[in-house]
């Protein structure tokens, strides 16, 4: 289960749009199958995850946090934070595995190693831009993210979609009460968790924006009509974000670090230069989701990809290798990593999905524990027999009195 979206950063054309599980349209001809497909609330095969599915983007969102901070002036390219095995505030502790502890760490390195502390502190400073009014910082942050197409409909030429969620001060005033909340209550937003929700299409689009250093074209699937190129200005006019182009260079270097010395170094390749970011999205209903965003090549990027595998665990487990292989085939017209292809083909998450199905049945009170009748049933019967025979063996004889 999951989705993959690939865009051409140069024009916004959707190169690939995949959602799984897939269905055979002919199944709708069968009344029983049609009903089963529509009512399947677990696998949801009729649900377009690429356009409608909303997920916390996890660490793939950290670059966007940094870009907002750079534009707002709450941090610079030289800003460092000290990771103490994660972010700490009072009794709160957000763990981190960046490996660079108790020493100043810069932005470029923090992206490569995916330091949770760095982007938590960066987000805290964003919200605290005006220490006397947190709404100033969070609303400016939200406006910048809206300019990336986040928190609103993308306006594609497809009939469905989701806005996702980018929270504002009003959102938290309604939840906690006006003036009650503070940066620490919403700190997980900085890492793409908390209340952040995006679609795979939106993730691919903000990756294209980073590739373009600040602009994008509205994603669309139509290339031409009756052989004539698309002329609709909705899809042909460049849209600039609120982030200055100068802030994107360090972000791109950090995304390259992800492959050279960071979390994706296990599937880097010499065939082409790729820039990416791993993500692991926490999921309260089962194993974490595996996410990855990528653009390539270095000179005039041709493709931007977002991949999510539901319950796929780490971003490097499934989503990362899948995105990298797609980019390799598109950029080089060949794949030189057959072992990685085979590993993806052999991957299987049916055990995790089966566990979720059993949990669902238990919540509904419909689960029946399986019983192996041949082995367990006979064993129980034999035990009963032995117990009865033992009882008879030691039972005292009755004495009948004669009249």
Regions found by a protein language model. Give the residues of each.
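Beta-lactam-recognizing serine transpeptidase/beta-lactamase-like catalytic domain environment
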Residues: 2, 9-59, 64-315, 358-364, ...
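Hydrophobic, aliphatic-enriched repeat segments that assemble into extended interaction scaffolds
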Residues: 7, 11, 327-328
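Helical mechanochemical/support elements of P-loop NTPase systems and associated helical scaffolds
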Residues: 202, 319-322
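Short, gly/Ser/Thr-rich active-site loops of penicillin-recognizing serine hydrolases
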Residues: 230-239, 322-388, 393
């Amino acid at each position: 289960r999951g989705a993959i979206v690939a865009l051409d950063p140069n024009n916004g054309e959707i190169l690939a749009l995949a959602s799984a599980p897939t269905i055979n349209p002919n199944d709708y001809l069968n009344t029983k199958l049609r009903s089963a497909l529509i009512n399947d609330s677990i696998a949801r095969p009729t649900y377009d995850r690429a356009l409608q599915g909303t997920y916390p983007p996890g660490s793939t969102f950290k670059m966007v946090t940094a870009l907002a901070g750079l534009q707002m002036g709450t941090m610079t390219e030289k800003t460092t934070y000290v990771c103490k095995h994660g972010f700490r505030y009072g009794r709160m502790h957000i763990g981190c595995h960046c490996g660079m502890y108790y020493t100043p760490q810069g932005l470029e390195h923090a992206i490569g190693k995916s330091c949770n502390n760095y982007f938590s502190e960066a987000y805290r400073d964003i919200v605290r831009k005006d220490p006397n009014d947190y709404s100033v910082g969070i609303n400016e942050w939200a406006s910048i993210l809206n300019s990336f197409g986040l928190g609103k409909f993308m306006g594609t030429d497809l009939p469905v979609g989701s806005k996702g969620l980018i929270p504002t001060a009003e959102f938290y005033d309604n939840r906690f009460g006006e003036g009650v909340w503070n940066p620490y209550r919403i700190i997980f937003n900085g890492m793409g968790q908390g209340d952040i929700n995006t679609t795979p299409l939106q993730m691919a689009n903000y990756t294209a924006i980073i590739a373009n250093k600040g602009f994008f074209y509205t994603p669309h699937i139509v290339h031409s009509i009756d052989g004539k190129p698309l002329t609709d200005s909705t899809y042909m006019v460049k849209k600039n974000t609120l982030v200055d182009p100068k802030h994107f260079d360090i972000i791109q270097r950090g995304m390259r670090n992800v492959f050279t010395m960071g979390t994706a170094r296990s599937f880097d390749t010499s065939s082409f230069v790729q820039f990416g970011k791993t993500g692991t999205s926490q999921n309260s209903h089962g194993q974490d989701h595996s996410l990855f965003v990528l653009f390539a090549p270095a000179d005039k990027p041709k493709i931007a990809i977002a991949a999510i595998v539901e319950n796929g665990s780490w971003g490097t487990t499934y989503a990362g290798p899948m995105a990298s292989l797609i980019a390799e085939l598109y950029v080089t017209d060949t794949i030189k990593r057959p072992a990685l292809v085979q590993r993806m083909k052999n991957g299987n998450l049916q055990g995790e999905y089966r566990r979720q199905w059993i949990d669902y049945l238990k919540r509904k009170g419909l689960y029946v524990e399986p019983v192996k009748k041949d082995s367990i049933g006979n064993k129980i019967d034999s035990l009963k027999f032995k117990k009865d025979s033992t009882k008879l063996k030691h039972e005292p004889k009755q004495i009948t009195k004669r009249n």
